[in-house]
């Protein structure tokens, strides 16, 4: 071990090694969280200490600070990054052992957007139709194709097969999933036909170039939608993801009027893209897609 490795130099060293072993998105997250940790160390005059002198107590105090100022989930994610970085330091003999590995995650309540009521959905669509038609089309890709917001951000003109009514969707693992485009959406995107195949469907000014990180794209559309939410006094429990939950719930309940539960699952998996039955069932439970009929007579 080299006693001359300061906290800052050791953290920078570990980050540099991680740069080529994780995805760009993950590395950006690592860099952001480690910069917060470095600021914490500097504010307490710990930055020039040897990395081996940073204690479990120091790290716990930092994590407690993250928890107080954000959420259990953010605290746990920060812990995971620190654990990965300190594991790299241990593997490269900059520290004797990884003290972060002894720190446990804390229980975090699942954060899931609520579904919209029919009245809320109607009000949102009406307002977007009047004020922001590009945002409305963005939302319709989430609603009618059951895409995640970041998947909509990735869509380019070349991903649309107008003749076959098909859509190529790039998942986070870079694999391409093919989905059908329902007729009610296909009719609305005919204006895109013939445009530069490399253009993105959604940029700040409509179809066009937009070469920034996809997380920043997603954040842009979330902030744009927040103006609609604020105008309708919708709280933080509602967001773009809520449309996916809302329309999958609608589809599930409509299918259940005709098919058995098993048949409904089979049809739904083809549409939503869930790869396993258990994943679909868990998702449907989480969004309360199926509710019981009135059971008042059972309580009499």
Where do the protein language model's features map onto the residues?
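Basic, Lys/Arg- and aromatic-enriched nucleic-acid-binding interface segment
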Residues: 95, 107-114, 118-149
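Conserved tyrosine-mediated DNA breakage-rejoining catalytic core shared by Y-recombinases
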Residues: 145, 154-191
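N-terminal core-binding DNA-recognition domain of tyrosine recombinases/integrases
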Residues: 12-28, 34-112
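Short basic/aromatic active-site micro-motif
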Residues: 235-255
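Short, polar N-cap/turn motifs at the start of nucleic acid-interacting alpha helices
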Residues: 159-162, 257-284
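Catalytic-site neighborhood detector that most strongly recognizes the C-terminal catalytic loop/helix
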Residues: 170-174, 272-300
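A short, glycine-centered helix-capping/turn motif at helix boundaries
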Residues: 93, 131, 141-154, 254-259, ...
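Active-site/catalytic core of tyrosine-dependent DNA strand-transfer enzymes
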Residues: 182-235
